[in-house]
Swiss-Prot record:
Single GO MF descriptor: glutamate-cysteine ligase activity
One BP annotation, GO: modified amino acid biosynthetic process
Recorded family membership: Belongs to the glutamate--cysteine ligase type 2 family. YbdK subfamily.
The protein, known as: Putative glutamate--cysteine ligase 2-1
Pfam families xref list: GCS2 (PF04107)
Phylogenetic classification of the source organism: Bacteria, Pseudomonadati, Pseudomonadota, Gammaproteobacteria, Legionellales
Tagged with keyword Nucleus: no
Catalytic activity: L-cysteine + L-glutamate + ATP = gamma-L-glutamyl-L-cysteine + ADP + phosphate + H(+)
Function in brief: ATP-dependent carboxylate-amine ligase which exhibits weak glutamate--cysteine ligase activity.
Length: 373
């Protein structure tokens, strides 16, 4: 089946998807509660959309399409409050975080949905290990060529989003020494990584995608787990590298950071993307996952070594006029605060040092999600 035409969207509109953890309040482990929560959510109106995820201890929510920060944040608050209220009725906690600190993948149950069962049969144990939690950010594009230009222009900024959103330092009761350990699980899948370097939509659709479809490896764009991928049915590009933040404020701020970056890039403020930009892509990605804001990058054009934190601060200064135009100044102030106060990964490690139990770390995550304002 050919790839559908790229739908025209209003430029720089945005939407957010969040994968959230469902927590048993008796032991703070994950709990297979999504069937019950989905049933309860389906009985009344919901300020967005909700869907199951691949295992039953996960829930995905999505916002509507928005143009500005305040609209997006308002809806995320409404979604959060609705989820918390439903969770309270079922005695289920809900929180962000890219990984649960001590859950065992073998305990997870695959959600009873045809696609999830097919994925489980194909990938085996990797499917249950995919009980990880990310934020996906969509930015509207006017056509497929523009989408591919932005997708490849953003490649050098991927480490920014990994480090700023990092919230997965613990896996199966161990400190991994990574700030974002979640992405290591994604990288295990054969269709992960980055998109092929193609800047023309017809070439991507009729050339690359059709060839991949004819191999029998893929059926749709959903089969690609790329860090950034086009979504022709929505008319967007979708960034998939972010851990789910602990608060919805951070989720909104990250979306607006991407929106402002896209506005900046569309004015051709930087050299055009090139295949060779990806020579340092995996290394820079690793630096952001492992060291977070303290990582070191290699600039893909100059090969200069730069500090990740300083690169974000430099970028924020460049984006200031674009944030003003987009009414997202407060969102970028939040990004600035992360560079100075630390990421959610740092917060979680601090709470572990304070309480010395991972159950307490989960409890702190629950508090962060429900009490943020």
């Amino acid at each position: 089946m050919p790839l559908q035409p790229f739908k025209t969207s209003n430029l720089l509109t945005m939407g957010v998807e969040l994968e959230l953890q469902l927590i048993s309040l008796s032991n703070f482990d994950l709990t297979a509660a999504s069937p019950d929560i989905l049933e309860l959510l389906g009985r009344s109106s919901f300020p967005g959309s909700f869907t199951p995820e691949i295992t039953e201890s996960m829930l995905e929510i999505a916002t509507d399409v928005h143009e500005e920060y305040e609209q997006l944040l308002k809806q995320l608050f409404h979604i959060r409050d609705t989820l918390v209220a439903v969770g309270d009725r079922l005695n289920i906690g809900i929180c962000g975080g890219g990984t649960h600190p001590f859950q065992m993948w073998s305990d997870q149950r695959i959600f009873n949905k045809t696609r999830f069962i097919e994925v489980s049969e194909l990938y085996g144990y990797l499917t249950k290990q995919f009980t990880i939690f990310g934020q996906h950010i969509h930015i509207g594009c006017e056509d497929g060529n523009q989408a591919l230009f932005l997708l490849h222009s953003l490649n050098r900024y991927i480490p920014h989003f990994i480090a700023l959103s990092a919230s997965s330092p613990f896996v199966q009761s161990k400190d991994t020494l990574y700030n974002s350990a979640r992405l290591n699980s994604v990288f295990a899948f054969p269709l992960s990584g980055r998109a092929p370097f193609v800047l023309n939509w017809d070439e991507f659709s009729l050339g690359y995608f059709e060839k991949m479809e004819h191999t029998g490896i893929v059926k749709s764009m959903k089969d690609f787990y790329w860090d950034l991928r086009p979504k022709p049915e929505f008319g967007t590009i979708e960034m998939r590298v972010c851990d789910s933040p602990l608060t919805v404020e951070r989720a909104a701020a990250l979306a607006c950071y991407m929106q402002a970056l896209c506005s900046y890039l569309l004015e051709n403020k930087e050299p055009l993307p090139h295949e060779d930009d990806y020579l340092v892509y995996n290394y820079n990605r690793f630096q952001a996952c492992r060291f977070g804001l303290d990582g070191t990058l290699v600039h893909p054009k100059t090969y200069e070594q730069i500090l990740l934190r300083e690169d974000i601060l430099t970028t924020l200064r460049r984006l200031k006029p674009y944030a003003n135009q987009l009414n997202s100044t407060m969102a970028l102030e939040h990004i600035y605060e992360i560079t100075h106060k630390g990421s959610d990964a740092s917060f979680l490690r601090e709470k572990y040092a304070e309480h010395r139990t991972l159950e307490s770390v989960v409890n702190e995550s629950l508090k962060q999600f429900r009490s943020s304002k």
